[in-house]
């Protein structure tokens, strides 16, 4: 199985960029945004309360991102260690919202909640994000997992996309939602969950 070292492992600090070292993304006014990892956009109420408390304590602007995460904006560089201490103590880690690595795995509600879902897209997205988080790459990359062919997670517009079928998952590669939008190309049809992970 393919594995890569986690971006925050000991001894890897020398290859980090400024934003990587700060575990935050510098904004245009010189402050930073802090974006903890929230696999598949799932967050327990207790963790949500921690984000609210941190944002309140440090007077941060809070925004739900297009990547189904919660961004906190306006942090000063000297505040970052204290912010991350609170977040790490609550079980969060960096969402690498700034690095050349896996940004996120976006998911729809899937078969757990949606009447159209034919596979557990949330469970698959959590598994993929936990499996590939911190993976370094030449450029940022994103996954999308849709629980049916309605495509609510925009899976075909991601670098790697999965769309559930009644027999498994269709795997799409090479999608792009940026300046030159493109649908990914179908790579594998009806793959099992084990095959796509």
Question: Where are the model-predicted features located?
Answer:
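N-terminal basic/disordered segments at the start of proteins
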Residues: 1-44
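Small-residue-enriched alpha-helical segments and adjacent helix-cap loops
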Residues: 8, 34-166
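Compositionally biased, intrinsically disordered low-complexity regions
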Residues: 13-16, 32, 73, 163, ...
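Short, flexible, solvent-exposed loop/turn segments with mixed acidic/basic and small polar residues
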Residues: 23-28, 58-64, 177
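Mobile "lid/hinge" segments at catalytic clefts and subdomain interfaces of large enzymes
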Residues: 142, 147, 151, 156-197
